[in-house]
């Protein structure tokens, strides 16, 4: 279980995250929602330890993540895989090598320098690509792919880390509606098929209500809602987004996963 206790991050006098506390049981798909600047990205980056908390603790299976250093910290970052809005692929390298980068924490430094990837890791990376219909582009340069394809490669890279939890920071922010659906379906598949906990920052409330089984709403660095999507009221939506509720709750329909079933494979390779 992931437990966040009184987590705070200050930049000067401003609190990007202010006294956040919650727990996430294994296997949940949790959407972190709110306006830009609400503290969503900082929260996920603190959980991964890419940003340092000013106060509070992060516990995972009883281990104090905020106290980790050196090798133990690197191991935690492998167990809590990040997926970024910008994809963070190496464009000049082929797709398979980009996915194999997710295995670096398990390799001796000399192997990574000469790219001497073990066959079991290569097989794992190909299997991850095939999960998302990307096996056919394994030899292509990453920068030759569309945005939706690149994000699926980034998700495959996270999957080969064999993480306990995936932290997805606005993974669909730069994608069109079709690729938004494909990427969100990929995250849903990881969650339901592999049982990996997912925390996903989303600006769109409609998407969050469609895909997530729990929502954590943030405003000005503080958690103002924590519950099931059906429990989110119009008043809370106004507080989260500082908008008229009908501008946030259903003005445009989100892409729908088919019947909340696991997304089918074999239909997304060209996206």
From Swiss-Prot:
Any Pfam family matching the protein: ABC_tran
Reaction(s) the record says it catalyses: phosphonate(out) + ATP + H2O = phosphonate(in) + ADP + phosphate + H(+)
Subcellular locations according to the entry: Cell inner membrane
EC number(s) on file: 7.3.2.2
InterPro entries registered for this protein in UniProt: AAA+_ATPase (IPR003593), ABC_transporter-like_ATP-bd (IPR003439), ABC_transporter-like_CS (IPR017871), ABC_transpr_PhnC (IPR012693), MetN_ABC_transporter-like (IPR050086), P-loop_NTPase (IPR027417)
Domain ABC transporter as annotated: residue spans: 2-245
Membrane topology according to the record: Peripheral membrane protein
Entry GO MF terms: ABC-type phosphonate transporter activity; ATP binding; ATP hydrolysis activity
PANTHER family, alphabetized: AMINO ACID IMPORT ATP-BINDING PROTEIN (PTHR43166), PHOSPHONATES IMPORT ATP-BINDING PROTEIN PHNC (PTHR43166:SF6)
NCBIfam families xref list: ABC_phnC
Family: Belongs to the ABC transporter superfamily. Phosphonates importer (TC 3.A.1.9.1) family.
Descriptive protein name: Phosphonates import ATP-binding protein PhnC 2
Higher taxonomy: Bacteria, Pseudomonadati, Pseudomonadota, Alphaproteobacteria, Hyphomicrobiales
């Amino acid at each position: 279980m992931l437990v966040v206790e009184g987590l705070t991050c200050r930049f000067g006098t401003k609190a990007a995250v202010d006294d956040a506390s919650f727990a996430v049981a294994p296997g949940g798909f949790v959407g972190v929602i709110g306006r830009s600047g609400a503290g969503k990205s900082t929260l996920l980056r603190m959980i991964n330890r890419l940003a340092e908390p000013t106060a509070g603790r992060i516990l995972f299976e009883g281990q104090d993540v905020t106290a980790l250093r050196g090798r133990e910290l690197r191991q935690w970052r492998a167990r809590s895989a990040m997926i970024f809005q910008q994809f963070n692929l190496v464009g000049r390298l082929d797709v398979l090598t980009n996915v194999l980068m997710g295995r670096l924490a398990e390799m001796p430094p000399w192997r990574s320098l000469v790219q001497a990837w073990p066959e079991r890791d290569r097989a794992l990376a190909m299997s991850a690509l095939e999960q998302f219909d990307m096996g056919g582009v394994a030899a292509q340069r990453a920068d030759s792919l569309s945005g939706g394809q690149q994000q699926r490669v980034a998700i495959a890279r996270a999957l080969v880390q064999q993480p306990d939890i995936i932290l997805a920071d606005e993974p669909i922010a730069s994608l069109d509606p079709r690729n938004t659906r494909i990427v969100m379906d990929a995250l849903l598949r990881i969650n339901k098929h592999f049982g990996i906990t997912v925390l996903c920052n989303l600006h769109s409330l409609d998407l969050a209500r469609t895909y997530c089984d729990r929502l954590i709403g943030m405003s000005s660095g503080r958690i103002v809602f924590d519950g099931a999507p059906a429990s989110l009221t119009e008043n809370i939506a106004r507080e989260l987004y500082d908008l008229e509720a009908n501008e946030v709750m259903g003005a445009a329909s989100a892409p729908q996963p088919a019947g909340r079933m696991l997304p089918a494979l074999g239909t997304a390779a060209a996206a």
